[in-house]
Amino acid sequence: ADPVWKVTSTTTVFNSKVSTDVSYRVPAVAVTKAGTILVFCETRYGTWMDKSGRTDIFMKRSTDKGATWTEKNITEQAVSSKLSYMDPTVVVDQTTGKIFLFTSLWDAVGKPSAQQGYNNRAIMYTSEDDGVTWTRKDLTDEVQIGIYSGFTRMIGSFGPGSGVQMTNEMYKDRLIVPMRSFKVDADKGTVSNGGNTAMYSDDHGVTWQTGQPNKSGEWTVTEAPDGAL
């Protein structure tokens, strides 16, 4: 029989009512190999709107099953920054214990690229100490999609939400991260939705590849008992 989940208590991890200066959007949750709970969220300064200026990715971390939390600003931008880190997406390698956090870096507010996304960067943060410290890497050149169906497809954003580590024997330990693309029409000078795709790694996150895009938008992923996604 399917398990029955019962709500025994609730906890507000991020609360915009505490401060009038920030809004919290787009949460992502993971449980590490050690059982630590990690919750990530966009922290938008001054407004709740998308791509409206400085946006950081904050993390709340609990080692006691959610009773208490510590906070960390993962992206740590300067107060004067107008860049937006958006759509946190997290996946944990339960074999190695390594944690991967992905986020898209959007251009400075006020530039056309800030709305259309054609200068977006694919950023990966990794932690090998259960989420205490993080290392940043720009993956953009490694995972760009390139030409598909006659159009250039560029990094749009990730998930948002969570990735998955496969348990099916054929693809065991494969890490899969949902992502979205933009389609560039050079003749028309336009950038539009290029469909979603997935980024995946078969070497525990050392290298990453992207699949072919299909027609849809934001999405997330889970593995069914038969190994289907």
Predicted regions mapped to residue ranges:
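Asp-box/BNR beta-propeller blade signature and adjacent active/binding-site loops
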Residues: D2-L229
